[in-house]
């Protein structure tokens, strides 16, 4: 099911559409449009509520047919939960539930009126752009590698979702973020035999080539060797799929210093010599979701044509194993000149990132942010709801946390105290690539901080938030919303 969006201010009881979507709270209070349709139908919705057909419980919905006095042949009534607890999360959930409820209905046009609902600390523009993002997220279907018949069935159905309101800015931003999220999800969900470093580079280069104002430069192995990217190239040694460094540029801000995003692009992570085991390795195609997220953010920025300069850097590498693979106890030299003792080949993300972060310095960033599925420790600490945020800069932390709260793509700050740095000491090199059993997310951030000295830098660990767990889990596209909103706030 695919969606296209428009705004609509037509009178709901007479609008020409296949379905009008309204809401009901757990205390049986109807949304404004539900009240209008109830009155037009002679109290039919109230009657159904009284006999228990409509409960208002969050997660429920009921499709009503042929209400007297209502032109639309269907009215979808969505449960909103408790009115006094109806905030951003509940609103997003309600919109998603509405779209999923229409999946099997013969509907090609629907009017979503949930955007009229009051959401605490949010305005009309937010309601509209978040409705677009939530609806598009709920409608997403993975089809890239399905057989022909199943693919056709999954892709069938184009619904025009008319959102009640007039805030065109909200619609424009919502569509841009939704496209960026979908782009990131599509990349993240691809199998690793398709989404190799070369594929990732070719796909992003094609996007840049087809969007005026965007450019893409691809560095190959020889280019990286010339730059001295010994850490990145060490990780790449064991794979037949050779590495790429992807550099995307959007010049919307004249001579202003650029904002630079760096995303971890491990297209598959075996763990290397420290081989992963079943119960984790099968989800390691998602280890490039940091790269997918910053590419998705670039897509959103280009679509909305943000008036700033943006550079996105993705070190695209496969961490595999053969006779040439790097080993524990190896000492490698990074692009910065710092030497690194390898304690574990499965702590490879920080090795490719440290060279990419050093490379980013040449652009003199206004701010530098890296995004990575970096540590299982972050997922243990925060679960899947929150992205881990680490930075030495309180103002940057507040900017990112505020942006995340605004779009409900939230982060939680973890410390980068000096007390953790000693855990990375090495007898044989400048730094050890692991910090021991405790505080693994923080010591990974501390490792990266050693390669961002003098930069206004933050690290986002999306190990938990980048994908859903299990056989049916998929990439989420996070934190495209957070990053795009943060960039919008800089304009």
From Swiss-Prot:
Where is it chiefly localized?
A: cytoplasm
Task: Write out the GO biological process terms.
Answer: proteolysis
Q: Where in the sequence is the signal peptide annotated?
A: none
Checking HAMAP family in the record gives: Cytosol_peptidase_M17 (MF_00181)
Give binding positions for Mn(2+) 1: 269, 346, 348
- Read off the InterPro entries from this record: Leucine_aapep/pepB, Macro_dom-like, Peptidase_M17_C, Peptidase_M17_leu_NH2_pept, Peptidase_M17_N
Q: Briefly, what is this protein's role? A: Presumably involved in the processing and regular turnover of intracellular proteins. Catalyzes the removal of unsubstituted N-terminal amino acids from various peptides.
What is the name of the protein in this document? Answer: Probable cytosol aminopeptidase
Q: Which residues form the active site?
A: 276, 350
Q: Name one GO cellular component term.
A: cytoplasm
Tell me its EC number(s), please. 3.4.11.1, 3.4.11.10
Enzyme class, UniProt record, top EC level: hydrolase
Give the species this sequence originates from.
Xylella fastidiosa (strain Temecula1 / ATCC 700964)
List, alphabetically, the Pfam families matched: Peptidase_M17, Peptidase_M17_N
């Amino acid at each position: 099911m695919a969606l296209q969006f428009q705004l609509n201010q037509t009178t709901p009881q007479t609008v020409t559409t296949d379905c009008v979507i309204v809401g009901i709270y757990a205390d049986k209070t109807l949304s404004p449009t539900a009240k209008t349709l109830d009155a037009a139908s002679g109290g039919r919705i109230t009657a159904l509520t009284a006999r228990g057909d409509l409960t208002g419980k969050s997660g429920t919905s009921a499709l009503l047919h042929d209400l007297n006095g209502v032109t639309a042949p269907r009215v979808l009534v969505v449960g909103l939960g408790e009115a006094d607890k109806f905030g951003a999360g509940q609103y997003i959930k309600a919109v998603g539930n509405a779209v999923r409820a229409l999946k099997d209905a013969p509907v090609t046009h629907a009017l979503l009126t949930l955007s009229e609902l009051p959401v605490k600390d949010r305005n009309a523009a937010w309601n509209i752009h978040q409705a677009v993002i939530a609806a598009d997220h709920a409608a997403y279907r993975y089809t890239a590698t399905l057989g022909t018949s199943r693919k056709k069935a999954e892709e069938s159905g184009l619904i025009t979702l008319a959102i009640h309101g007039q805030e065109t800015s909200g619609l424009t931003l919502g569509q841009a973020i939704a496209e960026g999220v979908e782009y990131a999800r599509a990349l993240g969900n691809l199998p690793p035999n398709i989404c190799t470093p070369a594929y990732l580079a070719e796909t992003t280069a094609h996007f840049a080539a087809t969007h005026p104002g965007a450019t893409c430069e691809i560095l190959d192995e020889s280019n990286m060797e010339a730059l001295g990217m010994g850490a990145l190239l060490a990780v790449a040694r064991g794979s037949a799929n050779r590495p790429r460094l992807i550099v995307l540029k959007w010049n919307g801000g004249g001579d202003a210093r650029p904002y630079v995003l760096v995303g971890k692009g491990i297209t598959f992570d075996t763990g290397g010599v420290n081989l992963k085991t079943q119960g984790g390795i099968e989800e390691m195609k998602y280890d490039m979701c940091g790269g997918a997220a910053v590419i998705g953010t670039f897509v959103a920025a280009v679509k909305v044509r943000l008036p700033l300069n943006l550079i996105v850097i993705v070190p695209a590498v496969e961490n595999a194993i053969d006779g040439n693979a790097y080993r524990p106890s190896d000492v490698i030299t990074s692009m910065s000149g710092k030497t690194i003792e390898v304690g574990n080949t499965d702590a490879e993300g920080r090795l490719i990132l440290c060279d990419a972060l050093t490379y980013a310095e040449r652009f003199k960033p206004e701010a530098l942010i890296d995004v990575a599925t970096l540590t299982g420790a972050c997922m243990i600490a925060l679960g899947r709801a929150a992205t881990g945020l680490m930075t030495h800069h309180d103002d940057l932390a507040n900017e990112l946390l505020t942006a995340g709260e605004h779009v409900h793509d939230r982060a939680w700050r973890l410390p980068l105290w000096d007390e953790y740095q000693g855990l990375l000491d090495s007898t044989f090199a400048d730094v050890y690539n692991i910090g021991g059993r405790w505080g693994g997310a923080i010591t990974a951030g501390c490792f990266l901080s050693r390669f961002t000295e003098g930069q206004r830098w933050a690290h986002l660990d999306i190990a938990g938030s980048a994908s859903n767990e299990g056989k049916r889990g998929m990439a989420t596209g996070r934190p495209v919303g957070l990053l795009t909103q943060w960039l919008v706030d800089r304009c």
